[in-house]
């Protein structure tokens, strides 16, 4: 655990020249402060801001990274302090502007999300531009992109066999911003049980007209591959992984139907993150009711219709963004085939 004095830089406030110091320089204190969460991925409570830039500043002068960390003062009181880190110098003009704008919110007893929200609004309102308005950042993830997937399949009570995929949605989620960058969404014509049951329509909201005349699974898989290539996801230098709500989609449904139809399963479908497991690691409890429990546990509103594949993907993406915002690092949960 590292310690730093608010006056460690002689009150000049230049963190690029000597470790981490408070920004702006705090009044001199005789007792040191203890910084909690020295690096991302090791300690929760480490929050960051992406590079801040201004159109009027040169790249060399306008780059910088801000972090928000919870600290304890000598009396044991907890507070938040933003820091500037990184090798690049931050324009003194921009730094002074940001200091004036944030003012009393620099040391605030509020929680990290509230602090970030206040800071974002104040900085954006004073003309810091789009990058500043979206300055809340996330811990570095292991993947450049997350591919959120949630199948809907033919079903009935009692269950029919084999089940067939009838909705095939994928959201391309940027691993740095946790924002959706692209969407793949197709309905699939079932061939073994071409007529949807009333139970299936009631559960998924998919009616017969939505699947009649649609491409077969083989054709949809070919289009998925084309979409993956177009999005740069097949580049060996780009790390991506699928994310599902459970193991059923990629451990049972897709390989089972492909085996039945004699179709190969692409390698990129053979590793994934089970969001239920990720959530349980992050929150310490298992979401028995899947997305409903995860949304409730994170105080999120459910998006769209339950058991709509594309809406379920949006909920998964929203849950991932919230967990990432809290500092969670997503890791592969599936075992190699």
UniProtKB/Swiss-Prot annotation:
A GO term, aspect molecular function: 3'-5'-RNA exonuclease activity
Binding site for Mg(2+) 2: 150, 249
Cofactor note: Binds 2 magnesium ions per subunit.
Residues that, per the record, bind Mg(2+) 1: 150, 152, 312
Keyword set includes Cytoplasm: no
InterPro entries, A to Z: 3-5_Exoribonuclease, ERI-1_3'hExo-like, Exonuclease_RNaseT/DNA_pol3, RNaseH-like_sf, RNaseH_sf
EC number: 3.1.-.-
Protein name as annotated: ERI1 exoribonuclease 3
Gene3D superfamilies referenced in this protein's UniProt entry, alphabetically: Ribonuclease H-like superfamily/Ribonuclease H
Residues bound to AMP: 152, 307
Subunit and interaction comment: Interacts with PRNP.
């Amino acid at each position: 655990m590292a310690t730093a004095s608010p006056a460690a830089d002689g009150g000049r406030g230049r963190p690029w020249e000597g470790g981490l110091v408070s920004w702006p320089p705090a009044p001199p204190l005789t007792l040191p402060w203890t910084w909690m969460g020295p690096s991302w991925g090791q300690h929760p409570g480490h929050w960051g801001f992406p590079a801040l830039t201004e159109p009027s500043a040169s790249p060399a002068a306008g780059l910088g990274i801000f972090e928000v960390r919870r600290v304890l003062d000598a009396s044991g009181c907890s507070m938040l302090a933003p820091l500037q880190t990184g090798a690049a110098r931050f324009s003194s003009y921009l730094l002074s502007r940001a200091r004036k704008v944030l003012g009393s919110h620099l040391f605030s007893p509020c929680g990290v999300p509230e602090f970030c929200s206040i800071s974002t609004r104040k900085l954006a309102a004073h003309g810091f531009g789009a990058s500043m308005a979206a300055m809340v950042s996330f811990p570095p993830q292991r993947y450049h992109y997350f591919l959120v997937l949630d199948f809907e399949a033919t079903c009935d009570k009692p269950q029919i066999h084999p089940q067939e995929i009838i909705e095939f949605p994928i959201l391309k989620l940027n691993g740095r911003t946790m924002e959706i960058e692209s969407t793949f969404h197709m309905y699939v014509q079932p061939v073994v049980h071409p007529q949807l049951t009333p139970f299936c329509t009631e559960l998924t909201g998919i009616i017969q007209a939505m699947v009649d005349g649609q491409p077969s699974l083989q054709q949809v898989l070919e289009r998925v591959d084309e979409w993956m290539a177009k999005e740069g996801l097949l580049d060996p230098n780009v790390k991506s992984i699928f994310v599902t709500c459970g193991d059923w989609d990629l451990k049972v449904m897709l390989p089972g139907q492909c085996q039945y139809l004699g179709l190969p399963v692409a390698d990129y479908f053979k590793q994934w993150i089970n969001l239920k497991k990720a959530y349980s690691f992050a929150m310490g409890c298992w979401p028995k009711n899947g997305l409903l429990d995860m949304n409730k546990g994170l105080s999120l509103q459910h998006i769209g219709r339950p058991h709509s594949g594309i809406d379920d993907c949006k909920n998964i993406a929203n849950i991932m963004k919230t967990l990432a915002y809290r500092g969670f690092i997503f890791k592969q949960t599936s075992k190699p085939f």
